[in-house]
């Protein structure tokens, strides 16, 4: 192992590579995914405590991960605040308060040192800023004896390092076990929540009602997840694309695009099904086009339509998901849009949207760097708390907060904050892998000493118990009592723990966006709540 001690880069690459390989192997029916990198790092540093990874790797990886998550989830996050955000945050906050109260009772009963108990809670809740806040608060609460002060300041750090690894593993195992016990069907959950990957098709419908709203308003006013892409009218030889304000007439044949379930509803509300191929007209054509022109990004489709008269965006493919185009939606770099237009204007449509895969790969990095810099600066800001300590969002909370704001904005003038979907996923995966490899090497020495120290084993055991408590509380109350989809509930738990490895695991298991929605909806409040909870616990114990 000496070669890894001497070469930190080799150690980092080896931990990442072995962890990613092990993460693809199934153990007892589930895979750890990228979370396996954490445990490989822990194993390396337990065997040889001198194996280290530069702290900057941990910071950069964490900042990259949360920033790319925030960019992708920004718009949905602020939309959720008006619907499910209060519910999700109430669940997370209640679980943190309950776990802190249980920790106080257990620590008092076992007679653990206050600094050790507070550090143990931060490890069980896997929150580094909370541990740092405890260390910051200690000098004002202990005697002036330098020897005692130095020893006491080490206690929360040691307790944190002992409880942190199981603080991750217990959560992942609890999610895996509860998912099996609850017989979770992730695909069905995603479909019910409207985030599933669904195949979109077209169907011809003859209008038999004379009281329908304007064609562009049909989806909203009739609560249909569809779009009308073409109209056939008696007396007109060709199909035409409906413009803003156009209305239907009796006997019109509409080409309606949507999922099978929504198309069944549309037929019932609009008229009757008409047999025949919906795209048979030779004068109208369609094409899938890559969005690589930045001028088309971050602008609502309702406004964008003025730039493409006579054309219609009917579908947007983002990642593996096909979405029906809605007036309030915005395009992102890398989206694959389906455009309906007169056959002679298809080439013009291709030019308007860019359709350059090479240009996508050569995206502008300046907004990414500026956004990350703003996030780090916000994370450095300190907010005073009672007792002389201060609260800061750190290198996770700051970038996440800024990313959520920029992701919701999409663009500022000519600056596009979003990055291509594929680049976002690549940076996200790289960031979480770097973070887990680095953080895993920090706790090995403490784990090694714990193997022969009964007191350390007690701290590990109690920390694991606290982690189990908060995991069960969130999963059972969230899914069984509050009827939140299990994938979203597990995401809420990952956000409550503020640990990306948990999110990565459940996202890989569910293969939909529900976990990310739950994670981003509670992460900022959970980060602040745990920092305050750890310090309050310390004050109550002393």
UniProtKB/Swiss-Prot annotation:
Residues 190-272, 274-355 form the RCK C-terminal domain. It comes from the Bacteria. One of its GO terms (molecular function) is monoatomic cation transmembrane transporter activity. Its main location: membrane. One of its GO terms (biological process) is potassium ion transport. InterPro entries: AAE_transporter (IPR050144), RCK_C (IPR006037), RCK_C_sf (IPR036721), YidE_YbjL (IPR006512). The chain crosses the membrane at residues 4-23, 28-47, 51-70, 91-113, 160-182, 363-385, 390-412, 425-447, 457-479, 519-541. One of its GO terms (cellular component) is plasma membrane. Keywords: Cell membrane, Membrane, Repeat, Transmembrane, Transmembrane helix, Transport. It is found in: Cell membrane. The keyword Signal does not apply. It is a multi-pass membrane protein. PANTHER family: K(+)_H(+) ANTIPORTER SUBUNIT KHTT (PTHR30445), TRANSPORT PROTEIN YIDE-RELATED (PTHR30445:SF3). Belongs to the AAE transporter (TC 2.A.81) family. This is Uncharacterized transporter CE2102. It comes from Corynebacterium efficiens (strain DSM 44549 / YS-314 / AJ 12310 / JCM 11189 / NBRC 100395).
């Amino acid at each position: 192992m000496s070669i890894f001690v001497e070469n930190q880069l080799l150690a980092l690459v080896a931990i990442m590579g072995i962890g990613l390989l092990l993460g693809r192997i199934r153990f007892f029916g589930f895979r750890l995914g990228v979370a396996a990198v954490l445990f490989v790092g822990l194993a390396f540093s337990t065997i040889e405590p001198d194996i280290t990874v530069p702290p900057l790797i941990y910071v950069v990886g964490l900042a990259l991960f949360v920033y790319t998550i925030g960019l992708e989830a920004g718009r949905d996050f602020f939309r959720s605040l008006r619907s499910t955000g209060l519910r999700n945050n109430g669940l997370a906050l209640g679980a943190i308060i309950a776990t802190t109260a249980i920790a106080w009772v257990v620590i008092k009963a076992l007679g653990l040192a206050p600094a050790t108990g507070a550090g143990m809670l931060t490890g069980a809740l896997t929150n580094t800023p909370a541990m740092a806040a405890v260390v910051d608060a200690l000098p004002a609460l202990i005697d002036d004896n330098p020897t005692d002060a130095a020893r006491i300041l080490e206690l929360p750090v040691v307790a944190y390092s002992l409880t942190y690894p199981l603080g991750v593993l217990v959560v992942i195992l609890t999610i895996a076990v509860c998912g099996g016990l609850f017989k979770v069907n992730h695909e069905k959950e995603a479909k019910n929540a409207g985030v599933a990957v669904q195949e979109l098709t077209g169907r011809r419908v003859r209008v038999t009602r004379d009281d329908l709203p304007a064609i562009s308003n049909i989806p909203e006013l009739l609560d249909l997840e569809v779009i009308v892409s073409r109209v056939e009218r008696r007396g007109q030889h060709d199909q035409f694309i409906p413009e803003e304000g156009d209305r239907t007439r009796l006997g019109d044949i509409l080409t309606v695009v949507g999922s099978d379930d929504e198309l069944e509803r549309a037929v019932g509300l609009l008229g009757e099904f008409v047999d025949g191929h919906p795209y048979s007209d030779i004068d109208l054509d369609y094409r899938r086009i890559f969005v690589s022109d930045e001028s088309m990004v971050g602008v609502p489709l309702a406004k964008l339509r003025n730039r493409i008269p006579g054309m219609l965006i009917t579908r947007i493919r983002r990642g593996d998901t096909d979405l029906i185009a809605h007036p309030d939606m915005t395009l992102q770099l890398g989206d694959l849009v389906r455009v309906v237009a007169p056959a002679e204007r298809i080439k013009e449509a291709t030019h308007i949207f860019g359709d350059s895969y090479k240009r996508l790969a050569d995206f502008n990095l300046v907004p990414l760097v500026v956004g990350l810099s703003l996030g780090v600066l916000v994370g450095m800001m300190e907010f005073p708390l009672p007792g002389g300590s201060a609260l800061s969002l750190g290198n996770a909370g700051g970038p996440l907060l800024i990313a959520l704001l920029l992701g919701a904005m999409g663009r500022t003038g000519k600056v596009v904050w979003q990055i291509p979907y594929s680049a976002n996923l690549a940076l996200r995966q790289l960031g979480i892998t770097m973070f887990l490899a680095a953080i895993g090497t920090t706790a090995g020495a403490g784990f090694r000493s714990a193997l022969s120290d009964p007191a350390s084993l007690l701290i590990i055991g109690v920390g694991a118990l606290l982690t189990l408590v908060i995991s069960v509380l969130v999963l059972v109350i969230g899914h069984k009592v509050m009827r939140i989809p299990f994938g979203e509930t597990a995401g809420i738990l990952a956000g409550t723990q503020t640990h990306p490895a948990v999110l990565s695991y459940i996202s890989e298991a569910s293969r939909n966006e529900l976990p990310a929605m739950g994670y981003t909806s509670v992460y900022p409040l959970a980060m602040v709540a745990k920092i305050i909870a750890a310090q309050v616990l310390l004050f109550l114990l002393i």
